[in-house]
């Protein structure tokens, strides 16, 4: 997992509410378990429309997706955050995320940022006025700044540490390897062991 400390980027607008994981990553592309190679399938059906924001030249290379209310609803599929990250997004800003989508995103180092409707609408207005507008996100300070729009976001300390240091679940487990080995050595032989 890559480390995320600061993100400075243009933003890609997705001004739609209740975008579910099947729209983000359609079910026909869920046959693999690798984490990479999903970017091309992101919003697959919507990309057939040449006016869809992912198709527009001015938004190519954006690392921040600004989405409408209630992003990532529906079934739990890790492939949806994988596709977003594979496309190049490091962060998503919305008013609300489905809990499991939020957790799946944090687990791979994709930063979900919840904020007020006023802030999201303000960002949409900035993007519409000038697609080259940059946003600056500090994971360390838990802050977002885009010109005069400034706000803080909630992120628990453990998730913040994981994103700042690029730690996935395996990395975290390996940090406790000596404790695991000590536990195994102290257990009676007839009891099950962690190996």
Can you describe what each PLM-predicted range is?
Residues 1-68, 72-195:
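Cytosolic catalytic domains that perform sulfur/thiol-centered chemistry
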């Amino acid at each position: 997992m890559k480390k995320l400390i600061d993100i400075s980027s243009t933003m890609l607008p997705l001004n739609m509410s209740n975008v579910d994981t099947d729209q983000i990553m359609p079910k026909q592309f869920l046959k693999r378990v690798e984490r990479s190679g999903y970017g091309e399938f992101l919003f697959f059906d919507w990309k057939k429309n040449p006016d869809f924001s992912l198709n527009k030249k001015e938004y190519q290379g954006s690392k921040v997706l600004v989405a409408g209310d209630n992003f990532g609803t529906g079934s739990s599929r890790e492939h949806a955050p994988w596709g977003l990250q594979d496309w190049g997004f490091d962060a998503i800003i919305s008013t609300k995320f489905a809990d499991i989508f939020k957790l799946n995103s944090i687990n791979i180092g994709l930063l979900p940022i919840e904020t007020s409707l006023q802030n999201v609408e303000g960002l949409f207005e900035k993007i519409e006025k000038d697609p080259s507008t940059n946003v600056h996100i500090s994971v360390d300070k838990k802050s977002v700044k885009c010109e005069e729009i400034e706000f803080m976001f909630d992120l628990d300390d453990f998730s913040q540490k994981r994103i700042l240091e690029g730690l996935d679940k395996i990395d975290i487990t390996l940090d406790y390897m000596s404790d695991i080995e000590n536990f195994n050595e102290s257990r009676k032989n007839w009891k099950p062991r962690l190996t």
